[in-house]
Amino acid sequence: MPWAGYARPIAPVLTAFAETAVVYDRFYSISSYTAMSIGGLLAGRYPSELDRSGHYFAHWGDVLFFPEMLRRAGVRTASAQSHFYFDQRSGFRPAFDVYEVVPGIEEDHQTVHGITSPAQLELGLKMLSDPATVKGRFFAWLHFLDPHDKYEAHAGIGPYGHTTRDLYDGEVTFTDQHVGKLLDFVAAQPWGARTVVIVSADHGEAFGEHQCFRHGFELWDVLTHVPFMIRAPGLAPRRIDTPRSAVDMAPTILDLFGLPKDPAMEGESLVPEMRGAAAPARDVVLDLPRTTNSDRRRALIRGDFKLVAIGDDDAFQLYDLRNDPGEEHDVQWTARAKLDEMKAAYRALSAKMPAVCPSSREKLRGKKSHRPC
């Protein structure tokens, strides 16, 4: 994105927003696949830990999501979505007082058809115009999906070019315009000045890096390094370079409402460091459970190094992100001490993060007969 050094000015609204916000320069999604990332974000846990279906990654009622905790504390919760997964299948609906999906969404498990930002904006503005939603404390989650394959050209934007990356950039600009209209609406409301606004994403996108396209099958930084910006009353704009993860989002939002996190949550509140406290170093964990589409991947980020575990820890890769941000050179053979340190830390962490088997027994690709998940 432009505020992170991308040369093409594809998101002027969010670039201006970054000047008024606390910006995390090394923020990671929990996974590289929407259902896993969002489930983990809402639960404050890793997707491997959550009871779920093995194919659609539907979450069952015993998974506690932080919006449900807000509801119990008297906070009104609302969500507007623009993909068929977020309808009945995801299991997120019961955590919200108001939960709506853009009508007419086509169900396709390979790609996304159509343009939804205008309808998503309309749905979000309707929710935020309802006095029942905004008369007291409220939490609203609006998920814009248009920067997503299938990439569409948009009239009046660019032209940036005709490659898939060019089309994707145009989709970012198109969505940025609609997010801008949403932010303008919020700013004009009587409650706007006392409202916290958070901007983030559930995964990145690959355009040929590591011979990968789209997302959801690996844990490269191009798939997991995402924006995280927060603007709040009394919060001075600043940049934070310490690695952090979306697993911290649930404890952070609960803290902003004055509520403690659930004991099962893995993340920590970022509120103290947002307010100026030092940001202590913490490991970041990425988790891509085995599914019907791909084998398991996990990764551990500690400082400038990233350890990737493949399958049931059958193989490892080690990258120096400061000197090799594109993760092109595996340094495990030349940095043996660092490899041993990272593997020990990873195994200790994995021992505390057991994998819950999917409740639906679809055959999982790469599943070994002696391994339940």
Label each region the model flagged.
Residues 1-373:
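Catalytic domains that recognize anionic headgroups
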